[in-house]
Amino acid sequence: MDILKKLQEEFGITQSQAENTVRLLDEGNTVPFIARYRKEMTGSLDDQIIRQLSERLTALRNLEDRRTQVRTAIAEQGRLTDALAAKLDAAQTQTEIEDIYRPFRPKRRTRASIAKEKGLQPLADIIWGQKLIGTPEEAAKAFVDSGQGVDTVLDAINGAMDILAEQISDDADLRKLLREETIKCGAIVSKKTKDEPSVYEMYYDYREPLKKAAGHRVLAMNRGEKEGFLSVKIEGEEEKLLQRMERRLIRRSSDTADILRGVIADSYKRLIAPSLEREIRNDLTEKAEEAAIGVFRENLRQLLLQPPISGKVVLALDPAYRTGCKIAVIDATGKPLETTVVYPTPPQNKTAEAEKKLLALIEKYGVDLISIGNGTASRESELFVAEMLKKTKRRVQYIIANEAGASVYSASKLGAEEFPDYDVSLRSAVSIGRRIQDPLAELVKIDPKSIGVGQYQHDMNQKRLGEALGGVVEDCVNSVGVDLNTASPALLSYVAGIHAAVAKNILKYREEHGKFIARRELLKVAKLGPKAYEQCAGFLRLPESEMPLDRTGVHPESYAAAEGLLALCGYGLADVAAKRVSGLAKKIKSPEKTAAELGIGVPTLEDIMRELEKPGRDPREDAPAPVLRSDVLSMEDLQEGMVLTGTVRNVIDFGVFVDIGVHQDGLVHISQICDRFIKHPLEAVKLGDVVRVKVLSVDLQKKRIALTMKGI
């Protein structure tokens, strides 16, 4: 297989794009570095495409490795023919390669191998030849041998049938045909195994064609089966498939047709069907997991790239009942100022005392915003806060923060290192406050799998999920850029070219030498060599550096070009520092000529111009601002037809959940997102979007809210 050609076809890219991107990856360059600083070589492929290409490259190389292993194994048996080698070369998937290898794979002792040990292979060959002199029984008499355990003619025929059944099940072309037919006409079927209510009730008597099986339903059935509520199986059109096999394998003039029909039925029911069922279910699950990981990736990307609410003093409230609500007041830089615990919720209900304490904190520190975690007791805490805010003269608003993962962080080694003197619960409160001020900087401290914006994330391959989500975090961190002098080791470890040990060395260097004053100073950090510097330098910013270009996303390798461009346009570095640079595109007549003159490509020229005009620009500024509230709404207040503004909290295969401020997210089904047909909600909306929705229905008993985004 020509891997480069395959990548070209699958990604719709040119030969040079494929060759250059693969070469850059093989040279050890990181995805963010390639996407940002090697655009001329990749044809400006973005980080998501390059990451997908990298994953596909690994998969295709693994496929080639397996092809080589199989070819070697067959050759060592002395059974590799030209036809077999050609078949192996033509195989496009792992399944096809394994089908070809199946007859040659070392097997455990089977009914067929036992029959072969008894000397019945020649009889099997006679029956398979389908031309007899006399009857099958007469042919079988010669193989009766009590010493071999073949006591009767029937024993001989049955043994030969076992050999042929396995032989048929090992036919790669036949397996491919049956697999394709099953997928085309078969169904996934689930039945209940327990006569009791559960979240899987819709699957208690469920059937869906395989070619239409939705990924989220496949994963739901898998979970229901794992938890003991469902039995799940693949059903093919057995009679139709048996007829196809008979037409393919039995000649019209066959003298052994009746025996072969029995062989075919046994081969299909005992060997082929169970094997195909496992393969098809594994394939369905793998595809469903990949789709779910894709949604999780996009949700995580949008969550991490939520705009920070900067410059505000935040009072964070981590709700609870018996143990009280943990409070942390955090200044505009994220530094905790004071922590305490109040008890406004049941069973203590010390509302007046809690109110007095929090109002005092609001006045003492000039609190601008209250961040309330959305976990246990969140609703009661929100009601308490809304009432309390009516009693302060300051303009204070509140926001409901997604606290998923806060408890994981607070109990982690990282949480203990950051706040060794704080109780675990108070660390959670600090995290809830900080993730409003700068979601990216805070959320990188938490395992992405714990952030809770995916479907069935605990049911899938955790290694694959971890790799995929880690890539998303890396891309987000590098697209925003990191302040070298303030970033935590957790944030630094996601910067291109920097791993956890180097991140700690950067922190150690800061502690020993004070703030970095220039990017090139990074080369003095232990274990950070020239290659790592090349990868990370452009993503690390120094807002106070005397070198204005250190404050931007311009890579040090392009400083000379940037200064040359400034000179051509009548500017200097002082203008960059003073943010006076503008209209560069109008000042150069030909981008191609200017780029050539500066020794760079046009894409790099365009990136440099953007950075010089808006040094240190945060791409998150373009996202819609979070919805802040000052009063509370309850489900009982909702009326059919009411139009509200909300924030998309989660995107899943069948719709989106929207926070409309009633503590119970409403569901916009995929059919209610827009007037045009969409295959997936992500085609029209993403996590963090601020949207207008209309209430379709409210079920107070089941706590369900149905919303629409159509006709507003």
What residue ranges belong to the model's regions?
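Long, charge-rich intrinsically disordered scaffolds of nucleic-acid metabolism proteins
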Residues: 96, 399, 405, 410-480, ...
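Low-complexity, acidic/Ser/Thr- and charged residue-rich accessory regions of DNA metabolism proteins
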Residues: 139-147, 151-153, 206-207, 242-272, ...
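C-terminal accessory/binding modules appended to enzymatic or scaffolding proteins
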Residues: 12, 307-308, 474-508, 630-668, ...
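Long, charged amphipathic helices and adjacent flexible linkers at domain junctions
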Residues: 279-297, 450-481, 596-640
